[in-house]
A protein has these predicted regions:
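N-terminal twin-arginine translocation
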Residues: 17-26, 31-60
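N-terminal secretory signal peptides
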Residues: 1-19, 30-33
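Extended carbohydrate-recognition surfaces in non-catalytic/accessory domains of CAZymes
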Residues: 48-176, 229, 235-238, 250, ...
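An acidic-aromatic loop/edge-strand motif
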Residues: 143-146, 197-199, 205-272, 276, ...
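Extended substrate-binding grooves/exosites of carbohydrate-active enzymes
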Residues: 74, 90, 94-105, 191, ...
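Beta-strand-rich structural segments
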Residues: 272-276, 669-672, 712, 748-766, ...
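Accessory beta-strand-rich segments of carbohydrate-active enzymes
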Residues: 129, 148-255, 279-280, 293, ...
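Short S/T/G/P-enriched beta-strand
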Residues: 365, 646-668, 679, 722, ...
Length: 856
């Protein structure tokens, strides 16, 4: 955490390892053979750490007696309901009196027959399983049949049996959802428990009074995705984790434990706080203690409070301070983390405890100097990202969150924006552990009770995370900036005030596509601009004391592996094209990266995403804004950012050199590089040497002839790096490459497999589009496939896929039994030449499973 004073500095105001093996194994990122990140300095660090002994995955949610938090993901059953026909919706809503009496919902009792329901584990997104439909109204959500006009595929029911042992007789028990899309009704043992109408904020229900102790219990969750929260693909169903949490009646309040650090000289002061609630039958005398533990497990500080008396159904606030000598600061290069073990004691014993992860750091936004972290100037090199991925939709396994962040980190990114909603906890935790800063954004910009509730949930949930450097209360709320600017100013002020009340350590802002002269912007600590590079330049002249950053920039568009725009095929060339309101990668970064007063910014977007197909409509089913595609395969612009954001030398030449039939035509050849000079060779002959402009690129026009193009980058007259593209032959074989060849046998971990086609020389064929089939057997299961083609309407859930410009991706998930996962890939169909099939084996190792509700 940073200084308790909000980290804004207008003009008038003024020995530990970085990422540990423990952190990597926490989410299964330890790499035995990674083709994704091994090339970068960060990737080399990951690979090095992977060679050291690690920790079992269960320690990710280590139980601290007597509290239990049990994963509630396994062993569910699912069936579609219906949005308008009660007869096809378990009879729900057939009578106006459904809610008249408690305990009468038969579908959540033991006698109900669910034998024909589909068995599945969570997280689950049913929208990604549905076919595509040509519907202009649905284009922003990815042309999936979800919404009020599709009642037969917009409601889903989840059901599960579970045991509550007799030992839980005197405990409080909650079911906790990290997120479900969108409108949720929960029933337990025939009783209606509660509802939630937001697709992103976590929610929970106290089940204590409704459970049969020492017996079987039944929970049913109805999820209705008829309405959306955004204008992008959002999925449908219980797409995040579910937990069953058990505590003593005297327990810590949810998300009430805070650790706020103030760095001074070589030390830091920790302001510790929490709230204890008493849901027992008697008045309790309780005290709270803190134990601060570093990454090695060593206790480095302690604190304790005097006892307080807490009334029945009452609560008490506890606070203390602790000192850290020579703290290991959290930074993007060394994301050092500490844990605070918070314990409630009463009657001579521990009644409740929890572990709170935090970091010590100081983040400052300055009106003249931009952004600094721990006193060092640092540009925010960020991307905006939605939360879906090829093959799995919105239901991302935890490991895939780390995979996606690793792609962005490999590019040189050091920050992400959670566009446009509260993120999943695993994304935030991965950012904490990887050293990725974050702009954390709420979905609904409103000072209504519902809007403030969502905002409060987000801030409380994540205010201890060092990766978060600013809160965002909204995105492009142009009505609140224009005709309702008066109301917008009041809404913005109320939301900013709520953020400051809950977390006085961070700045508050929003992504604004107006002039920031009125409306919601009045109350912001720092000013964010979406696009319009003249806007922030003029604003800075008029308001030189307000810190600025690019909240959303670029909107460059391209199709991976495509080098000529074709409106009939819905493809865009890779030469840094933009939409009318956007800027090229070079233009936006020259402005935000080149002006000292700008803190940096967030490019739209890191990954391609489903829905909002831009610049084309049907049959395009996802956007083409990404710097990488839906699978995480880099587009050429990736290497512009890698050159100017990263620390490693870069030379990247493009396009590929397979242009049969275009002999003699001029082909633009570009090179992204951070070298002093680049010389281009065409079939062994020099086409000239060029100096590389700062934050720019070099380019030539070359008459195509089969052979090779090669770029040689030099510094100080010495060639340091080369990159080459050769004309390949036709594809003759398939190759499979896993991001890891060993994963955890925990029922959750995944391996991400790159599929490519090779010619007879073993070279990747960049134009191959063969249709392949996949077979997965052994100790794992196929869970999804993709290829990064924005126009591909093949199923993400069938084990077959066409290569797109030479690539596809398969995702497999481990079972809980250690062994081997066998993946096979072969060409499907009789068209074209035969391809040599490929096989790959992934080992799944036995690990201690994290605590979970037993799978029936």
């Amino acid at each position: 955490m940073n200084n308790p004073q909000r980290a804004v500095r207008p003009k008038e105001r003024g020995r530990m390892p970085g990422i540990s093996r423990r952190d990597l194994l926490y989410s299964g990122l330890a790499l035995s053979a990674s083709t994704l990140v091994a090339r970068s300095a960060w990737g080399q660090t990951v690979a090095l750490m992977a060679s050291h002994p690690g920790l079992a995955s269960a320690e990710a949610l280590e139980a601290i007696a007597p509290r239990e938090q049990l994963l509630f993901d396994f062993g569910w059953k699912f069936q579609f309901g219906h949005g308008t026909d009660p007869a096809r919706d378990l009879g729900f809503g057939n009578s106006q009196g459904d809610f008249a009496k408690t305990g009468e919902f038969e579908f959540s009792k033991g006698k109900f027959d669910d034998s024909k329901w589909r068995k599945l584990n969570l997280p689950h997104d049913w929208a990604v399983e549905l076919p595509f439909v040509w519907d202009d109204v649905q284009n922003s959500h990815g042309f999936k049949p979800v919404g009020r006009r599709y009642p037969e595929t917009s409601v889903g029911w989840y059901r599960r049996e579970f045991d509550i042992p007799a030992s839980d007789k005197d405990r409080r028990i909650w079911v906790e959802f990290d997120g479900a899309f969108r409108s949720v009704l929960v029933f337990v043992n025939g009783c209606f428990i509660g509802r939630n109408d937001n697709g992103y904020a976590p929610f929970r229900f106290d089940l204590t009074d409704f459970l049969a102790v020492g017996a079987k219990n039944y929970i049913v969750v109805r999820v209705d995705a008829s309405f959306g929260d955004g204008w992008f693909y959002e999925g449908a169903g219980i797409y995040r984790h579910v937990w069953l949490t058990k505590t003593d009646p005297l327990h810590l309040g949810r998300w009430e434990s805070t650790v706020r650090s103030t760095v001074s000289g070589s030390g830091a002061t920790l302001a510790l706080g929490t709230i204890v609630e008493n849901q027992g039958k008697n008045i309790e005398s309780a005290k709270v203690s803190w134990k601060i533990v570093d990454a090695s497990g060593k206790t480095v500080a302690t604190a304790e409070t005097p006892a307080q008396s807490i009334a029945v159904d009452g609560a008490a606030t506890f606070s203390a301070t602790a000192k850290l000598a020579n703290p290991a600061l959290w930074s993007v290069d060394e994301p050092n983390l500490y844990s605070a073990i918070v314990t409630v004691e009463s009657g001579g014993k521990a009644r409740d405890a929890e572990r709170v992860s935090f970091g010590v750091r100081t983040a400052i936004f300055d009106a003249e100097k931009g952004f600094s972290l721990n006193g060092k100037s640092l540009k925010i090199q960020g991307t905006c990202n939605h939360q879906d991925h090829a093959g799995v939709g919105a239901a991302l396994p935890d490991r895939l969150q780390w995979f996606r962040l690793a792609v962005l980190r490999e590019m040189g990114g050091n920050a992400v924006r959670t566009s446009h909603n509260m993120p999943t906890p695993e994304w935030v935790e991965a950012c904490d552990r990887m050293g990725m800063m974050m702009m954390c954004e709420t979905r609904q910009m409103s000072s209504s009770a519902e809007g403030l509730s969502q905002l409060e949930t987000m801030v409380k949930r994540y205010r201890n995370s060092p990766s978060i450097i600013l809160w965002s209360i909204g995105n492009e709320e142009w009505v609140m900036q224009s005709e309702e600017a008066e109301q917008g100013a009041k809404v913005g002020a109320t939301m900013v005030r709520k953020c400051h009340e809950l977390d006085p350590t961070r700045v508050v802002s929003a992504a604004v596509n107006g002039d920031n002269e009125k409306g919601v912007s009045d109350a912001f600590d720092i000013i964010g601009f979406n696009y319009n590079l003249k806007g922030p330049e003029g604003y800075h002249k008029e308001h030189p004391k307000r810190p600025l950053y690019g909240s959303e920039t670029s909107s460059a568009i391209s199709t991976r592996g495509v080098y000529s725009t074709d409106a009939l095929r819905n493809t865009v060339n890779a030469y840094d094209s933009v939409v009318p309101w956007g800027e090229t990668a070079e233009d936006w970064w020259k402005f935000y990266g080149g002006n000292d007063y700008e803190a940096g910014g967030f490019a739209w977007t890191g990954f391609d995403y489903r829905g909002e197909p831009t610049p084309y409509g049907w049959p395009s089913i996802n956007s083409q804004f990404g710097i990488v595609d839906m699978c995480g395969f880099p587009k050429d612009t990736f290497y512009y950012y890698k050159a100017w954001w990263g620390k490693d030398p870069v030379v990247h030449v493009f396009p590929h050199w397979n242009f049969e039939g275009r002999e003699g035509e001029e082909i633009p050849v570009w090179v992204y590089s951070n070298m002093d000079e680049v010389e281009l060779f065409v079939n062994g002959q020099s086409a000239g040497r060029q100096k590389v402009p700062h934050l720019g690129h070099v380019q030539w026009k070359v008459k195509y002839a089969p052979g090779a193009i090669e770029a040689r980058g030099s510094k100080g007259g010495t060639v340091l790096l080369t990159d080459k593209r050769e004309t390949t032959g036709p594809a003759v074989a398939i190759k499979l490459i896993a991001d890891r060849t060993e994963i955890n046998a925990d029922g959750e971990d995944v391996a991400v497999i790159k599929v490519e086609a090779l010619d007879k020389e073993g070279r990747a064929v960049p134009t191959a589009n063969n249709h392949l089939g996949f077979k997965v057997s052994g100790a794992g299961a196929f869970i999804g496939v993709g290829n990064g083609d924005p126009n591909c309407q093949e199923s993400d859930k069938e084990p077959k896929r066409s290569l797109f410009n030479g690539l596809a991706q398969v995702i497999v998930q481990a079972t809980k039994e250690p062994g081997e996962i066998h993946i096979e890939a072969a060409k499907e169909g009789w068209d074209g030449p035969v391809l040599t099939p490929a096989k790959l084996t992934i080992t799944t190792k036995k690990v201690e499973l994290r605590p979970a509700v037993l799978d029936k």
